[in-house]
């Protein structure tokens, strides 16, 4: 006889416990496997120095949840996000303010995503800034550290020349842009 076995395979836990478990484990990936120099999210646990721009945005949001839920302190979260922002600002190659899909987390150099994708990636940059803008809103205390972080995020956000990435002056943005192709 064929059919679906609908017996429980795992222990049932209350919804709140499940939410906590998912949030904690998601956060742990970004926290534990963040690049030691840049703080950015690695593409995979086995990717060495390759970090991902969009994944870093997801990681920043996970850090905000972790601070709010008490998995880490607010200070730990602000320090890691500032580390990422400083790396983006001082070390990374930016293309009219936008970043590549993949970056070398030790040097800031663009790591080509494919043969002709060796420049800006607006989708990944957008995902990164979703996290950073959420951090800018979350870290709203009137302290020197949080004020500096907000100012740095704002400066990077405003440095993106979205208009430059318009396709032939139309109301369409390029997804990828390469300095070579």
Q: What residue ranges belong to the model's regions?
A:
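Well-ordered alpha-helical scaffold segments within catalytic/enzyme domains
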Residues: 6-16, 58-72, 87, 127-142
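Extended ligand-binding clefts on enzyme/binding-domain cores
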Residues: 8-9, 16-17, 97-126, 141-181
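Long, well-ordered core segments of solenoidal/helical folds
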Residues: 22-38, 80-96, 148-171
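Membrane helical hairpin/interfacial module
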Residues: 49-57, 61-119
């Amino acid at each position: 006889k064929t059919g679906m076995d609908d017996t429980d395979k795992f222990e049932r836990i209350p919804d709140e416990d499940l939410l906590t478990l998912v949030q904690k484990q998601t956060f742990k990936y970004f926290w534990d496997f963040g690049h030691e120099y840049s703080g950015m999210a690695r593409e995979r646990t086995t990717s060495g120095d390759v970090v991902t721009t969009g994944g870093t945005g997801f990681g920043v949001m996970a850090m905000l949840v972790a601070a709010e839920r008490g998995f880490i302190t607010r200070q730990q979260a602000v320090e890691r996000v500032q580390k990422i922002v400083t790396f983006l600002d001082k070390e990374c190659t930016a293309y009219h303010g936008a970043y590549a899909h993949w970056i070398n987390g030790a040097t800031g150099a663009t790591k080509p995503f494919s043969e002709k994708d060796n420049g800006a990636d607006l989708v990944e940059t957008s995902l990164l800034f979703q996290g950073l803008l959420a951090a800018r809103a979350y870290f709203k205390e009137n302290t020197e550290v949080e004020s500096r972080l907000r100012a740095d995020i704002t400066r990077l956000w405003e440095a993106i020349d979205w208009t430059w990435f318009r396709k032939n002056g139309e109301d369409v943005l390029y997804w990828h842009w390469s300095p070579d192709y």
